[in-house]
Amino acid sequence: MTTLDSNNNTGGVITYIGSSGSSPSRTSPESLYSDSSNGSFQSLTQGCPTYFPPSPTGSLTQDPARSFGTVPPSLSDDSSPSSASSSSSSSSSSFYNGSPPGSLQVAMEDSSRVSPSKGTSNITKLNGMVLLCKVCGDVASGFHYGVHACEGCKGFFRRSIQQNIQYKRCLKNENCSIVRINRNRCQQCRFKKCLSVGMSRDAVRFGRIPKREKQRMLAEMQNAMNLANNQLSSLCPLETSPAPHPTSGSVGPSPPPAPAPTPLVGFSQFPQQLTPPRSPSPEPTVEDVISQVARAHREIFTYAHDKLGTSPGNFNANHASGSPPATTPQCWESQGCPSTPNDNNLLAAQRHNEALNGLRQGPSSYPPTWPSGPAHHSCHQPNSNGHRLCPTHVYSAPEGKAPANGLRQGNTKNVLLACPMNMYPHGRSGRTVQEIWEDFSMSFTPAVREVVEFAKHIPGFRDLSQHDQVTLLKAGTFEVLMVRFASLFNVKDQTVMFLSRTTYSLQELGAMGMGDLLNAMFDFSEKLNSLALTEEELGLFTAVVLVSADRSGMENSASVEQLQKTLLRALRALVLKNRPSETSRFTKLLLKLPDLRTLNNMHSEKLLSFRVDAQ
């Protein structure tokens, strides 16, 4: 967005505001030092503010008081609570939000009204214009960390990332206006502002403007001036000339993120996998809900022991006798699997998300290895479909006869077990408890995609807003997976078998600091398994667990509550139909919902505590 300001004094101000809407709006030197950017446009709301046609980086606005305008409130980041809260806590180039680092603020040199902050000896000029800091609006001293910034904001950002400073929580809902005179009041909001305008540890760190960047900015400014001069005569009042449609570089305010338990994995893939909300469909009958959910549950969920050919008990017997377990084609066609425990957790998380999105195709980046032992960790192997298998257990093959694609068809004695989950605490000696817990959480990653796909097939789920869809998935995925994998907890033997076909005792895992959470998981699994739910009942209960109207951050709780009631009616009808004599069975099933919420909170707190300790 570009704004122009003209007055009777010499010079004037031209302010280029990043299309992401993250730079403060200023239309006069006085507003450069105002305590709140909101005041600059609140005083100009009367008259006929009209928008210029879009420029290469945004649109121009007209101010009736000075024949030029200011940025509409909806596009000013300091006026939108969502802008400050939507930025992440890690410095990454993803914070450009479609706005190139060259989107800038400049001011015509006017020493009587624009002065650098204290300690600033260098003023970055471009053809007689003074560049302004994208964070606070002070005079920029150069091109620092990917944007034009003043010495104060450059040093502040450098200290923040080098010392990994955790700033105190903002007392104003992370909605502080960051300008020159108050930039030190709230350090958390200032750091988020740095990230939102595009500052990154991976970006340019030196003060000189690259030649290509300088040429691009000059062309951008000249084009904006030409548009302003040519279009002034044809401007109309706002009531008769609608605002132009936002360009690809303009980003409107996004809803504030909903506080939710620490997610198991990165959920950035949800918006891509979910569909936009559609027009409300007719409310389905109870029979339709039961049949649709049961079918989705039966066809979508594959990461469960009942789909792997053997039950936990049978597997333990086979494993004790040395016979490899049987596997089904569904298991072989896994669409992505965890990396080995030897990988860095963050890198593993990135690979998981890429695998879930189908971004990584073809052979693995790891060289294939074939250990000769009875059970080893091995590297990822591509199967014939291009999907990678993660062989947690590799049963030895005759020497020199290893198949090229890592899969020997028709020979159950020499088979790679594709593991949808890969929890292996003993994969490397000397591993910390934090690393083991990270692997424990990461082990759920491959099943997340199935949860998303299952949600899309719940009648009425896609009628919800995309924000509410994502919020429900973020908050409820762990609970859904807990229901899915409850059968993997053997209460009698006090063991848990992960889908890697590796069994661990409760005592063994409890010694690693997992006792409280695992005890709660065992108790829940015992209670849920005692109800002996059918496949249809389990599918409907899974849908009820996911669609919970009391999740924090919902936009339209009424719609979610209505969908939840529909699912509850269907579940009640099905339970009473299957066992009409057990009238308390439905009530007992509903009592598992608060137990799941407790487990979710326990897992989030445990994972968060380990992450804090690891820093």
UniProtKB/Swiss-Prot annotation:
Compositional bias, Low complexity, is annotated for 14-34, 72-103
Which parts of this chain does the entry mark as a DNA-binding region?
Answer: 130-206
Enumerate composition-biased segments (Polar residues).
Answer: 1-12, 35-48
GO MF annotation terms: DNA binding; DNA-binding transcription factor activity; DNA-binding transcription repressor activity, RNA polymerase II-specific; E-box binding; heme binding; nuclear receptor activity; RNA polymerase II cis-regulatory region sequence-specific DNA binding; RNA polymerase II transcription regulatory region sequence-specific DNA binding
Where on the tree of life does the source sit, at the highest rank? Eukaryota
Phosphothreonine sites (modified residues):
275
Q: How is it modified after translation?
A: Ubiquitinated, leading to its proteasomal degradation. Ubiquitinated by the SCF(FBXW7) complex when phosphorylated by CDK1 leading to its proteasomal degradation. Ubiquitinated by SIAH2; leading to its proteasomal degradation. Rapidly ubiquitinated in response to inflammatory triggers and sumoylation is a prerequisite to its ubiquitination.
Signal peptide region: none
| Entry's localization field | Nucleus; Cytoplasm; Cell projection, Dendrite; Cell projection, Dendritic spine
Q: Which Pfam families match?
A: Hormone_recep, zf-C4
The UniProt record gives the binding positions of heme as 419, 603
Using the record's annotations, give every residue carrying the modification N6-acetyllysine.
192-193, 401, 592
Q: Where is this region: Modulating?
A: 1-129
| Region ranges (Required for phosphorylation by CSNK1E and cytoplasmic localization) | 1-70
> Where does the record place Pro residues bias?
253-262
Q: Which Gene3D superfamilies match?
A: Erythroid Transcription Factor GATA-1, subunit A, Retinoid X Receptor
Q: What is the induction note for this entry?
A: In bladder smooth muscle cells, exhibits night/day variations with a peak time at circadian time (CT) 4-12 and a trough at CT16-24.
Give start-end positions of each zinc finger (NR C4-type): 133-153, 170-194
Chain ranges of the NR LBD domain: 285-615
Which residue stretches belong to region Crucial for activation of GJA1?
A: 49-285
Q: What GO biological process terms are annotated to this protein in UniProt?
A: cell differentiation; cellular response to interleukin-1; cellular response to lipopolysaccharide; cellular response to tumor necrosis factor; cholesterol homeostasis; circadian regulation of gene expression; circadian rhythm; circadian temperature homeostasis
* Swiss-Prot/TrEMBL keywords: Acetylation, Activator, Biological rhythms, Cell projection, Cytoplasm, Differentiation, DNA-binding, Heme, Iron, Metal-binding, Nucleus, Phosphoprotein, Receptor, Repressor, Synapse, Transcription, Transcription regulation, Ubl conjugation, Zinc, Zinc-finger
Share the domain note from the entry.
Answer: Composed of three domains: a modulating N-terminal domain, a DNA-binding domain and a C-terminal ligand-binding domain.
What family classification does the UniProt entry report for this protein? Belongs to the nuclear hormone receptor family. NR1 subfamily.
Give a short account of what the protein does: Transcriptional repressor which coordinates circadian rhythm and metabolic pathways in a heme-dependent manner. Integral component of the complex transcription machinery that governs circadian rhythmicity and forms a critical negative limb of the circadian clock by directly repressing the expression of core clock components BMAL1, CLOCK and CRY1. Also regulates genes involved in metabolic functions, including lipid and bile acid metabolism, adipogenesis, gluconeogenesis and the macrophage inflammatory response.
- Recorded protein name is Nuclear receptor subfamily 1 group D member 1
**What is the native source organism of this protein?**
Rattus norvegicus
**Which lineage do the record's taxonomy fields give for this organism?**
Eukaryota, Metazoa, Chordata, Craniata, Vertebrata
